[in-house]
Amino acid sequence: MSIREVIMDYLENSSKKALSVEELSVALHMNKAKDYKVFVKTLASLEAEHLLNFTAKGKVELAEKEEAKVVISGIFRANAAGFGFVSIDAEEPDVFVARGQTAFALDGDEVFIEIDKNANALKGTSAEGHVVEIIRHDVHQVVGTFVALNDDEKEQTGLIGFVKSRNKKIPYRVYLENEGLIPENKAIVRVEITHYPDKEFPQTMQGLVTEIIGQADDQGIDVLEVLASMDIVSEFPKEVLDQAEAVPEEVPENEIVGRVDYRNEITFTIDGADAKDLDDAVHAKRLENGNYELGVHIADVSHYVTENSPLDKEAYERGTSVYVTDRVVPMLPERLSNGICSLNPRINRLTQSCVMEISPEGRVINYQISQSIIKTTERMTYDAVNQMIAGDEAALENYAKIADSVKIMVELHHILEAMRKRRGAIDFDTVEAKIIVNEKGLPIEIRKRTRGIAERMIESFMLEANETVATHFEAHGLPFIYRIHEQPKADRLQRFIDFAATFGMQIEGTSNGIDQKVLQAFMKKIKGQPGEMVLSTMLLRSMQQARYSENNEGHFGLAAENYTHFTSPIRRYPDLLVHRLIREIGEGKTPANILQKWEDKIPEIAEHSSHRERRAVDAEREVEKMKKAEFMEEHVGEEYEGIIASVTRFGMFIELENTIEGLVHISTLKGDYFNYQERMLALIGERSGLTFKIGQPIKIKVVKADRMTGEIDFEYLPSELDLIDKAAKAKKKPDHKGRKKSNQSLKVKSVAPKSTDKSANKSKNGRRADEKFEFDKKKKKSAKKPFYSKAAKGKFTDKKDNGKKFTDGRKKPHKRG
């Protein structure tokens, strides 16, 4: 049970009508400092939701039944189609909010909702509700394209134009008065919101231009617009740059004192050829006792970025560096990342080192985590090391000084890889796109990014260091920030198990308690099979997102009990924090007040860093989609073979060899009626038996690509690749209209849907905005009842209440069936 459920359950069953906060905390064993803070915060939340009251004497009691409302606070997550979901907390399933029931909430807003329909674990349906109040707006600025009104419209309205938001989840136009900055038509601008949509003006917002970012035809403006729309800023404040400039370019002798000296080790960096921020170096050797020594040396960024300094505050705000196709938005100024904190060859550099003694079985026997100094022997690239591993004589001769070290590293890498496989780590080996752009930022080539042994080897060493550092802090019971990856949720995993069964793949175990080794064995079984890419992707989608936390929940994907991020403090704030914790409390001899300080601070840092990471990933994906669509604009009309990557009721997404994905809309499949088989994730033609299912090869033609939306449309082309389901075709007899009956699947007519309100059913390129389909994807099958289920019982039993008005005049919506 969640904390809120525990509190409510105790009060409902208590012999006392009211208890003091202290009595309640002691009774629930939540009176220790760490738990008490969360306990009090939960009480405040329950009071705000009218589930608890505080008496005149400050005691806690349940709200009177007639006063109790099923009102919950949460974060609204909008869908571009107009509906959304409210996230309550990590332990509770999301609540579906239909289009028209959002009270004009925007994506990210904190809201109060009332529950209209409880979740049904047996049917696998989510709870449904409606927004009753917006507590706090999350969106304060909008970035988009300015569209000027003509002179007549300006005179009639007193407005100069409107801005179309780059964010698809903000469907409203933002109108501008003749104040502040006046942009030219089609300019890309940033607008401060001054008025949000409401009942009087339900389809519009109003604002003032605070920045003219550029013109639509400026070079690189497309990427800049995406970054600006997500509040990702390249420029650093002056005080931050000033602090960076004050950092010396060389390491003075007095800063070496007290550090472990690894300058005599054969230590080198291995990075991409175009990398400039070289923040990690490695050394490896075989010991006389038969074990291996692996040293992972990371730039000591925390030595220069001190706590609460301008550099630190800016790094915290950014959270992470953002990597898009043609640029990097760094977390720290280049003066640091490419200068004193870059482990350039043959130069003294301050580091934090994790040096491990590892057995031939891959077990860490001993380790030392220390402040250190190194002087790297070489600056190596992945390509050069891969050539050495492949036995290239020229490469081996050019880098003879490190050749023995590389050989030992390869041995150790294979040992560590085998160790992780034995314990159940899952290797998804996902395929990434490499987008090549010209000097104008235009995409000229897109191909799969390759990973050789060198790339895997460095990743393997970084994993080992991260795990060792986390294990150290866990063993000493110190406050820490962990990188956690929780076990998959049962409902999502069950959908994958069902899906794999359609490929004839049986997965042992149950969705409630599956072991990593089972999934690892499954990945090994599908290796090299036709459906490998699709099945691997679907399994990855069934996993939870990794995140940062002050609580150690382990890492499911790595099958690791302890894990953190230690190896990239130049580009990730949690790594910088880990370095700071090593420096300040890592030895375990720390005053209680310092430990308490970090116990209080780490939860907020973890949550903020997770949010910033998701923002960076969203930006990177958005730019990638845009550049892929821009690339395909030059290939409209061309034909390709691809693989069906996913199937929905409105069509299917096809992935090409170079990772580009496009939609074949259901309305373009002519001459048959197609049934959508949700369990199989397939479309099957009633008359022809023509079948489209995930993993199937298919031939297509590119018919449209839109760089602004990032959407690409394909047209299906009949070919010898097609699959005919003869059994499906034969088992149904035609009715009087010549159609075959089906009670087991959803019938989807292969013509464009008709609607008097086109915007309600389609997006700009004709994609169906089907909220029920999207809702079905969010179904929860957990047997656990939501915490509000008791309060919800009987709330809507009075049929006379159906017409009850809210304070804003809206009628309460009828329950969905």
Swiss-Prot record:
Residues 637-717 form the S1 motif domain. GO terms for molecular function: exoribonuclease II activity; RNA binding. Residues 767-777, 795-810 have a biased composition (Basic and acidic residues). Residues 259-584 form the RNB domain. It catalyses: Exonucleolytic cleavage in the 3'- to 5'-direction to yield nucleoside 5'-phosphates. InterPro entries: CSD2 (IPR040476), NA-bd_OB-fold (IPR012340), RNase_B_OB_dom (IPR013223), RNase_II/R (IPR001900), RNase_II/R_CS (IPR022966), RNase_II/RNase_R (IPR004476), RNase_R (IPR011805), RNR_Ribonuclease (IPR050180). One of its GO terms (biological process) is mRNA catabolic process. Its EC number is 3.1.13.1. Residues 729-742 have a biased composition (Basic residues). It holds the Pfam family S1. Residues 728-817 are annotated as: Disordered. It comes from the Bacteria. Keywords: Cytoplasm, Exonuclease, Hydrolase, Nuclease, RNA-binding. GO terms for cellular component: cytosol. It is found in: Cytoplasm. 3'-5' exoribonuclease that releases 5'-nucleoside monophosphates and is involved in maturation of structured RNAs. Belongs to the RNR ribonuclease family. RNase R subfamily. This is Ribonuclease R 1. The lineage of its organism: Bacteria, Bacillati, Bacillota, Bacilli, Lactobacillales.
